Amino acid sequence: MLVIPAIDLKDGKCVRLRQGRMDDATVFSDDPVEVAGRWVEAGARRLHIVDLDGAISGEPRNAGIISEIVARYPDLPVQVGGGIRDDDTVQVYLDAGVQWVIIGTKAVSAPHFVNDLCLEFPGHIIVGLDAKDGKVAIDGWSKLSNHDVIDMAMHFEQDGVAAIIYTDISRDGMMQGVNVESTVKLAQAVHVPVIASGGVTNLDDIRRLCAVSEEGIDGVIVGRALYEGTIDLAEAQKLADQ
């Protein structure tokens, strides 16, 4: 199982939000490229980058910084989300060297978009499903839809997505522990890799996910816990490799 450090970008800085709220952001660094380097040195095998300004505006706002990170660390596979609403943006990121592009809001509002992208860019499309109480959230988590998260995951599996990132937004950034039960439930319903996200606080969370990783959980995204020092990346990855 991969332990994937998260870099969330807002106004060119590396921040963490609580429960996805843009008005509740903690700035951890003014230099996201340096932060990426720190995770590379600690042994990161993949990086998760989100353009938060892009997620709100609907178009990339931190693409320059993301391109810089990818250029600086060409051997590090990177997945990027936030504000990706058309195939031109996908093309720009893939041309820059990004490995996977994450589709969030538009996957829910226009599901055929994911199907089109999977045909155009096979193997490079990941869907991010952010849910609360089993329902999918959209627009930077500011709205809850009527869509059931498992139904949507099964739909995107048919489209040919490379993976599904599942975030329990009631836990995200709250350091309350990962929602293992709902993550397993989703992973059991599909055959594509599921990446867990939201609420990872300490090594116990990593252990709990490792114990069920055979259900189809291939990775876990860790944010605030790395920045606040409650998880050491090298230690967490060593645990996940056992």
From Swiss-Prot:
GO terms for molecular function: 1-(5-phosphoribosyl)-5-[(5-phosphoribosylamino)methylideneamino]imidazole-4-carboxamide isomerase activity. Keywords: Amino-acid biosynthesis, Cytoplasm, Histidine biosynthesis, Isomerase. The lineage of its organism: Bacteria, Pseudomonadati, Pseudomonadota, Gammaproteobacteria, Chromatiales. It catalyses: 1-(5-phospho-beta-D-ribosyl)-5-[(5-phospho-beta-D-ribosylamino)methylideneamino]imidazole-4-carboxamide = 5-[(5-phospho-1-deoxy-D-ribulos-1-ylimino)methylamino]-1-(5-phospho-beta-D-ribosyl)imidazole-4-carboxamide. GO terms for biological process: L-histidine biosynthetic process; L-tryptophan biosynthetic process. The keyword Transferase does not apply. GO terms for cellular component: cytoplasm. This is 1-(5-phosphoribosyl)-5-[(5-phosphoribosylamino)methylideneamino] imidazole-4-carboxamide isomerase. It comes from the Bacteria. Signal peptide: none annotated. Its main location: cytoplasm. Pfam families: His_biosynth (PF00977). It is found in: Cytoplasm.
